[in-house]
């Protein structure tokens, strides 16, 4: 099956109309801030409580594979920048059927992530007494409407908002790392207890709850790294991706390792793992325990910003992905048009509409909404990352066959690192199905999702074929025929 020519109209037209409004500083901060969000600021509390201090090992291992995925994405972007990102690459290397599945799984990811973020925002607001009388679903709805309004204006404003929101998140983590290190180095007691490694020995060691909980939290940790792929989508709206992308990816990997692994180690050294609670930010717990309630409020405001930023990024990315799919016939037609400011508003509104289902979930199951949706969203993350790696492997294979030339910025140790990453992602997916509490939700989502994807493809395949043949007639290219087959 021959690939599409990267100059083919079907691959380039989906990027027409976008304003190249993102600058280098914005792209780098989007790449960094996109991966520092709700999964760390809120989710780490419950994972520390269930897995203990050894949680940092899981963050470290997952971080290695995240690095490989980012490098694979970087190689693809330098091969051909596109706002359709990995969905466009799936179309190029595997055909429209794979692009259809990858695109809708990614939409599922961000639609569910939006629910996670609005749920987290409601939890954060309930930290303050003034908001406690307000129902969780009401706060979630307000958050969704505010972020939707911001996202519909322009990509330049999106980039600026994400830059400052990401900067706030980074400053918050750096502040915690500095304050926490001072308490640790000074051997100051917190809440009447010693700090340091002695906390581990006095509370059951590095894995006090056993190895199984450490393994089971892996899916949640994977979700904490979600949104790293956002930099690939944003690359399609920057003027110099070949110059900016390698710098952004390489700098982000080291900083994420420091922030994620460093933060979880420090949290475990400052307080016993039993001090942390599900649905409560561990950073808020720390600052409250050291007797600075105002600091806890400030940190709570910061993590609230993180959730709003993640929600904003999700609406941004799905709008671009759905437009790419719509132009090629596999997405709803109303997601293809753009506003005068270069915003694909149809996909953004569709994602926000799905987010309304999360508002209902918050009203029915407020205590379980976060974890239920997180595990479903994680399947979309895994599908997106697997698609990125699979596309890089195909690019590598074709380069070896002399069909195209690989960029200089490459995934290290390819193809072996790619196969290892795919095996890791498959292992995480299996673990999610065996999760005692949330496994049934995963099974239910699969039972509903797989037939929906199959049925969806049969609904759109004739339109996909028509679009493909139109491109063949227009470009006189036979390279697109494989994507036109309605199998």
From Swiss-Prot:
Keywords on record: Amino-acid transport, Cell membrane, Membrane, Transmembrane, Transmembrane helix, Transport
GO terms for cellular component: extracellular region; plasma membrane
GO biological process: amino acid transport; transmembrane transport
Chief location bin: membrane
Membrane-topology descriptor: Multi-pass membrane protein
Knocked-out gene: effects: Asparagine transport is partially impaired in the mutant. Knockout mutant is impaired in nitrogen incorporation from asparagine into other amino acids, such as glutamate and glutamine. Growth of the knockout strain is greatly reduced at pH 5.5 in the presence of asparagine as sole nitrogen source. Mutant is not attenuated in immune-competent mice.
PROSITE patterns per record: AMINO_ACID_PERMEASE_1
Transmembrane regions: 26-46, 50-70, 98-118, 133-153, 163-183, 214-234, 256-276, 290-310, 341-361, 369-389, 414-434, 440-460
Functional description taken from the UniProt entry: Dual function in both nitrogen assimilation and in protection against acid stress during infection. Involved in asparagine uptake.
Family: Belongs to the amino acid-polyamine-organocation (APC) superfamily. Amino acid transporter (AAT) (TC 2.A.3.1) family.
This protein's name: L-asparagine permease 2
Organism annotation: Mycobacterium tuberculosis (strain ATCC 25618 / H37Rv)
Lineage of producing organism: Bacteria, Bacillati, Actinomycetota, Actinomycetes, Mycobacteriales
